[in-house]
Amino acid sequence: MSVVTLRSERPRLSDVAPTPPVFERCDGVCEVRFARRDGVSSLVHLFQRAPCRVLFPNVPADDLPLAALLTTSGGLAGGDRARISVGVENGAQAVVTTQAAEKIYRSLGPDTRVDIALTVGADAWLEWLPQETILFDRARLTRRTTAEIEPGGRLLATEMIAFGRAAHGERMSAGLLHDRWSIRAAGRLVWVDALRLDGDIAARLDAPAGFDGATAVATAIYVGADAPTLLPLARAL
């Protein structure tokens, strides 16, 4: 009788390729819509999915309804996604803001993606006034904002971006910011804007032909039939 001994072919730990860590990412959704009923603007639709959430602070009875958006995670990181939809139906009025500044944390590779859709019905009024977005060093943010405004509708929107937390002595030196706006009024494209900063962002912030040392940027947008009459006021700001 012969005896055969089989050699074990177990792989050694040194032969196993390391697996990159997989982090759980979020996909938040927020939908808010206001309508005018019996002469009063009020909430008619709300949908929210973590980490997006909507608060409704108490306001005086004669004031516009107010919604405050927030992310319960305290901010967004690489690979996270948030989709926000805000609408005011015909004749309605509303103010939508955020509870605090939105923080975009450092990414290990993937982009943070944010999609914002604003709709303003005929003869309606929407104030979209979020607090600033703070970009941490090596954050990667891709954001798209679209607005559709029906005839007679008006939109006041602001956007503020801070390249780091200046009060903490922090500054964004590298990463990605790809921010796009598109606004249509009465079916006509009236404003498009795109900002893309990639790679060595510090150099672009310091460039005299770029941001000339600024660490924050802000934009205010007003769309309405009476916009030309407000130009002197805007230029005086």
Where are these regions (language model features)?
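Feature marks extracellular polysaccharide-active and adherence modules
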Residues: E89, G121, E148-E150, T158, ...
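Short, solvent-exposed aromatic-acidic interface loops
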Residues: Q99-I104, E132-I134, M160-F163, L195-D200
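A structural signal for small-residue-enriched, beta-sheet-centric alpha/beta enzyme cores
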Residues: I161-L237
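Acidic (Asp/Glu-rich), glycine- and aromatic
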Residues: F136-R144, I149-A174
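Short, intrinsically disordered/low-complexity patches at protein termini
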Residues: A101, T119-V120, E150-G152, A166, ...
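Broad gene-expression machinery/nucleic-acid interaction feature
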Residues: D27-E31, R81-R83, R113-D115, T142-R144, ...
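N-terminal, charged/glycine-rich beta-strand/loop interface patches
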Residues: S2-E132, D137, R144
